[in-house]
UniProtKB/Swiss-Prot annotation:
<dbReference type="InterPro" id="IPR001412">
    <property type="entry name" value="aa-tRNA-synth_I_CS"/>
</dbReference>
<feature type="short sequence motif" description="'KMSKS' region">
    <location>
        <begin position="333"/>
        <end position="337"/>
    </location>
</feature>
<dbReference type="Pfam" id="PF09334">
    <property type="entry name" value="tRNA-synt_1g"/>
</dbReference>
<dbReference type="InterPro" id="IPR023458">
    <property type="entry name" value="Met-tRNA_ligase_1"/>
</dbReference>
<dbReference type="InterPro" id="IPR012340">
    <property type="entry name" value="NA-bd_OB-fold"/>
</dbReference>
<dbReference type="InterPro" id="IPR029038">
    <property type="entry name" value="MetRS_Zn"/>
</dbReference>
<dbReference type="GO" id="GO:0005829">
    <property type="term" value="C:cytosol"/>
</dbReference>
<feature type="binding site">
    <location>
        <position position="159"/>
    </location>
    <ligand>
        <name>Zn(2+)</name>
    </ligand>
</feature>
<keyword id="KW-0030">Aminoacyl-tRNA synthetase</keyword>
<dbReference type="InterPro" id="IPR009080">
    <property type="entry name" value="tRNAsynth_Ia_anticodon-bd"/>
</dbReference>
<dbReference type="GO" id="GO:0004825">
    <property type="term" value="F:methionine-tRNA ligase activity"/>
</dbReference>
<dbReference type="InterPro" id="IPR004495">
    <property type="entry name" value="Met-tRNA-synth_bsu_C"/>
</dbReference>
<feature type="short sequence motif" description="'HIGH' region">
    <location>
        <begin position="15"/>
        <end position="25"/>
    </location>
</feature>
<feature type="domain" description="tRNA-binding">
    <location>
        <begin position="575"/>
        <end position="677"/>
    </location>
</feature>
<dbReference type="GO" id="GO:0005524">
    <property type="term" value="F:ATP binding"/>
</dbReference>
<keyword id="KW-0862">Zinc</keyword>
<feature type="binding site">
    <location>
        <position position="336"/>
    </location>
    <ligand>
        <name>ATP</name>
    </ligand>
</feature>
Length: 677
């Protein structure tokens, strides 16, 4: 029976836009996608959104290292992330970026409302400053010992061991991640969100019964230790949104990151030309449901800061947080050296998406437990469950239906009671999907698969096929097997989208949750084709080896203009003013006898001629092509005596050298002798 349709907005945590998606990320996105696909099958209106978390100093510094702009880097990373998620059939309705107009507007709106309501406080703080790099250090660019649990090598904003959050100034023995220097203290005015003002509201929200027990218990610990005001600003230089009316101050990435959920949904509504849904979903009294799938490492931000920000700015709070644990591989933390730190794109070169989707789903529950991807067990389970139990059920029966009955199924069920047993299981399996007890759902489905295969074994259609006069029995037995297979695949459709498409093509019928009550009778199926191939350990070995090779490649020195040629020490304006740059016309260009590197250039400075030797021969093998071109030269460089003659200046060029040298030229309209300023 179709349920009353609900309006549901589902999000995953926003991947940071400075690295590739790996199998740790995929646990969350697969978990959310399975749940979303089930909700859609039940007829609910679901909007499933995500975005890249695109702000912060790490992105700014990595872009500098690569010699590109932050905007270029996050654009390229967004395309990579979306390709990976599409490869795993994550069915997002929209994938956006926190570096967007929608997110800027919403961040400023929420900040302004919080400020108007008295929840933003200003005060001068002592902040860690890197004396070698000349910059204030963001939280994640300071490491030290956690002030709460005393775990070493923890970041400056939160501890990955105990989950505590704190100010980077509270770290014990802090070090700059950028330079390794010991930071010094400097004063800076910062903006704080008054989280303690929301303590009563947050405690009531915790006691509502919606949150996972483990989350509620952890929040209670935080309440008992006391909530602190939250620093939401960062000093320039910083890649992000500047705070309104506060030049040189930027929103801390964790302020605008969760607002990215709203920004992505706003972007989706605008794409659809929908002017009402955003308010319907986000207004304070909304009856829509809002769920955030997140990892246990970011519970603090989502269970305290985020609902408080929403409450203080008159938006609705999340209906619930669905929190999961970490992924281990072969019983240990993912390791680059062992080849078990596996990128999503690497996985898809060796296995299909459905295999990982199935394995993760079979291990997931509603608890915050870590999931181990045991690669040997993975191979065995995929082969045993998907291939041997489910797909084999279809292949054992389809051949007879195709060959003996032209693909037409029997007009009646051979065992209506058995079929009812399968359809009655929809309530238990549906509840397991609904409550995120995915492992339980898989166990129920595989138990039914065992029953279906026993039925075929007992009926032995391969024996019946050889007995004269039993065509009707053969058709009935095989049709029963295919109908049981259809029910199983309907239950598995949220998990195995690619296989489900192949099955729907074979059955000539859509897998629909409510349609299983009516079996396929007298229905013509299409010719059966292999639905799924077995996997083996050789594929695993190739995957691990490929991951090791990628690590080696990534460990190679970063190249790029800035990496290869770092920016020189800072000079004063007076130093720069000593350099006299002039536009020069190349009046003549010729080879230099006895040199395979130099060209002799005769330059016209608009009334004065200069003779310049330049090491650009490799880049300009035809000197005649330079004649008549304008360039820029250092006009006040002291003449240099060379064995070929005297060089009276230097022309300006870019590039590392050799054939990669590029003479600088002014725009059209510049005249010889004009000063370059």
């Amino acid at each position: 029976m179709t349920q009353v349709a609900k309006k549901i907005l589902v999000t995953c945590a926003l991947p940071y836009a400075n690295g590739s998606i790996h199998l740790g990320h995929m646990l969350e996105h697969i978990q959310a996608d399975v749940w979303v696909r089930y909700q859609r099958m039940r007829g609910h209106e679901v909007n499933f959104i995500c975005a890249d978390d695109a702000h912060g100093t790490p992105i700014m510094l990595k872009a500098q290292q690569l010699g590109i702009t932050p905007e270029q880097m996050i654009g390229e990373m967004s395309q990579e992330h979306q390709t990976d998620f599409a490869g795993f059939n994550i069915s997002y309705d929209n994938y956006h970026s926190t570096h967007s107009d929608e997110n800027r507007e919403l961040s400023e709106l929420i900040y302004t409302r919080l400020k108007e309501n008295g929840f933003i406080k200003n005060r001068t703080i002592s902040q860690l400053y890197d004396p070698e790099k000349g910059m204030f250090l963001p939280d994640r660019f300071v490491k030290g010992t956690c002030p709460k649990c005393k775990s070493a090598d923890q970041y400056g904003d939160n501890c990955e061991v105990c989950g505590a959050t704190y100010s980077p100034t509270e770290l014990i023995e802090p070090k700059s991640v950028v330079s390794g220097a010991t930071p010094v203290m400097r004063d800076s005015e910062h903006f704080f969100f008054d989280l303690p003002s929301f303590s009563e509201m947050l405690q009531a929200w915790t006691r509502s019964g919606a949150l996972q027990e483990q989350v509620a218990n952890k929040m209670q610990e935080w309440f008992e230790s006391g909530l602190q005001q939250w620093d939401i600003s960062r000093d320039a230089p910083y890649f992000g949104f500047e705070i309104p009316n506060a030049p040189g101050k930027y929103f801390y990435v964790w302020l605008d990151a969760p607002i990215g959920y709203m920004g992505s949904f706003k972007n989706l509504c605008d794409k659809r030309g929908d002017t009402t849904s955003f308010d319907e979903y986000w207004k304070k009294d909304s009856d829509a449901e809002l769920y955030h799938f997140i990892g246990k490492d970011i519970v603090y931000f989502h269970s305290l800061f985020w609902p408080a920000m929403l409450e203080g700015s008159h938006f609705r709070k999340p209906t619930n947080l669905f929190v999961h644990g970490y992924v281990t591989v072969n019983g240990a933390k993912m390791s680059k050296s062992r080849g078990t730190f596996i990128k999503a794109s690497t996985w898809l070169k060796h296995f299909d998406a459905d295999s990982l989707r199935y394995y993760y789903t079979a291990k997931l529950s509603s608890r915050i437990d870590d999931i181990d991807l045991n690669l040997e067990d993975f191979v065995q389970r995929v082969n045993a469950d998907i291939v041997n139990k489910v797909v084999n059920l279809a292949s054992r029966n389809a051949g007879f239906i195709n060959k003996r009955f032209d693909g037409v199924l029997a007009a009646e069920l051979a065992d209506p009671q058995l079929y009812k047993t399968f359809t009655d299981a929809a309530a238990v399996i549906g509840e397991a999907w609904e409550s995120r007890e995915f492992g339980k759902a898989i166990r129920e489905i595989m138990a039914l698969a065992d029953v279906a295969n026993r039925y075929v074994d007992e009926q032995a259609p391969w024996v019946v096929a050889k007995q004269e006069g039993r065509d009707a029995d053969l058709q009935a037995i095989c049709s029963m097997g295919i109908n049981l297979f259809r029910v199983l695949m309907t239950y598995l459709k949220p998990v195995l989208p690619t296989l489900s498409e192949r099955v729907e093509a074979f059955l000539n019928s859509e897998l629909n949750w409510d349609a299983i009550e009516q079996p396929l009778l007298g229905h013509k199926v299409n010719t059966f084709k292999a639905l799924y191939n077995r996997i083996d350990m050789k594929q695993v070995e190739a995957l691990v080896e490929a991951s090791k090779e990628e690590v080696k490649a990534a460990a190679a020195p970063v190249t790029g203009p800035l990496a290869d040629f770092p920016i020189q020490e800072t000079i004063t304006f007076d130093d720069f003013a000593k350099i006299d740059l002039r536009v020069a016309l190349i009046e003549n260009a010729e080879f230099v006898d006895g040199s395979d590197k130099l060209l002799r250039l005769t330059l016209d400075l608009g009334g004065e001629k200069r003779n310049v030797f330049s090491g650009i021969r490799s880049a300009y093998p035809d000197p005649q092509a330079l004649i008549g071109r304008q360039t820029v030269m250092v006009a006040n460089l002291a003449p240099r005596k060379m064995r070929f003659g005297v060089s009276e200046g230097m022309v300006m060029a870019a590039g590392p050298g050799g054939k990669d040298i590029f003479l600088l030229s002014p725009d059209d309209g510049a005249k010889p002798g004009q000063q370059v300023k």
